[in-house]
């Protein structure tokens, strides 16, 4: 359980992806490619720009953010990746992001905002999503030991305690993972994790 980074090669260039594997709940995968944007798949469904997921998590955590505020959570290449993701995103608000994600996960165009919001809140609630204590510890130790983090807020998230609340995914976890993807993509000799040796 935790987050794992893997590399793929596209047209002779190496790109990294991340898998967030909980003990219980949906797998979240983030991938990057030549357009320097980050895309997300939840439970291997259709991908969408990571900016929609960032908006939804900010809203669920009762700290809604404008697109500019989302970009300011990042520095360097990670900020560029988020800006590029925003440019690819059809959704332009938290409500639209809930709807877009719901459509991709449920393969349905018949949805209202209340249903989409309820679905996402439930999907990542403690009752349906659990990183486990081990998963949270792995996530925290990875980002405590892998500089640089974008800002103090991301570093604070990486040192969260392993309470029941600490065993769910947070906006700052997503930010730390995006930062790591950008760092790996911009590090010449970076290599992915060997998942067989992480047990």
PLM-predicted stretches and their roles:
Residues 1-199:
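N-terminal non-catalytic structural scaffold regions of very large proteins
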